[in-house]
Amino acid sequence: MNNIHTPVLATEMLSYLAPVDNETYLDCTFGAGGYSKLILSNCNCKVIAFDRDPAVISIASQFYQQYPNRFTFFNENFVEANKYLSKLDKLNGIVMDLGVSSMQLDEANRGFSFRYDAELDMRMSQKGYKASEFVNEASEHQLADIIYKFGEENKANKIAKHIVLARKKKPITTTLQLANIIREAVGYNNYYKKNKIDSATKTFQAIRIFINDELSAIQNFLNQSLELLAVNGRLIVVSFHALEDAIIKKFMHQNAVKKVAQSKYSTNRQSPLQNGVLYLLTKKIAVPTRTEIINNPRSRSARLRAALKINE
């Protein structure tokens, strides 16, 4: 298990989660096991982990051996957690590390990255609708809508038009084929100078989010999380782009205790609190240090939000 990577914002995650002996924590996005290992190594606690990617089952099996009676794994999307955990004792903490994992990006045959020429797949669960099916079957309007909505790509209409024109000549089946169509549509050098990213990046993000239904899964799970957490349990979420963070921020703020405004003439020196379930531990997002970004460039867009459940 020495090859397990150190996940982003590891120190910050542990600081906000503050795991202790004899408590139980949920790792919603097991991946290569980075967060689970940090938590289990920190104290004599238990971890329940979820991940829909069958490629991580072999890693999870190593945890069963190293942490007997302390680790449980479900090869399921975290949105299914309530189905498996609702009859168990409530959790003392939940951690989520969202988006595509480094392991998935680095496996060329998964089709998440245009750094390799591979089948255009992008399925986290390796089941269901492939990215290649979407780009070859969706209408130009559907393509533009998804690319704009989930990629926040201002040139979505132009990209969609080029995809439709290209697939009439030849089906789009590989990552580099799609990336080059996008680059041809919007240019490469000028786009990079303006945005500091490859011109295919936002479109690949959009298609991946759509194929895996990522944003609705996040929203659905966050709604479950308040039922799963015990009072004094902590919710830690790491996201990598504005669409994810907006959902998390809105959820936490909607469920947070709020100070009630009062007259400046009031003799009450303590601001009373409105009813709420969560206390925000991060008033602003936590972000990686310069050192972490240098050591792991993929961490540069990571942002962490944390909250404490204080009421049922």
Curated annotation (Swiss-Prot):
E.C. numbers: 2.1.1.199
Annotated catalysed reactions: cytidine(1402) in 16S rRNA + S-adenosyl-L-methionine = N(4)-methylcytidine(1402) in 16S rRNA + S-adenosyl-L-homocysteine + H(+)
Keyword set, alphabetical order: Cytoplasm, Methyltransferase, rRNA processing, S-adenosyl-L-methionine, Transferase
Gene Ontology CC annotations of this record: cytoplasm
Short name of one Pfam family: Methyltransf_5
Annotated signal peptide: none
Superkingdom to which the source organism belongs: Bacteria
Keyword Methyltransferase belongs to the record: yes
Residues that coordinate or bind S-adenosyl-L-methionine: G33, G34, Y35, D51, F78, D97, Q104
Molecular function GO terms recorded: rRNA (cytosine-N4-)-methyltransferase activity
Localization terms from the record: Cytoplasm
Function as written in the Swiss-Prot or TrEMBL entry: Specifically methylates the N4 position of cytidine in position 1402 (C1402) of 16S rRNA.
Protein family: Belongs to the methyltransferase superfamily. RsmH family.
This protein's name: Ribosomal RNA small subunit methyltransferase H
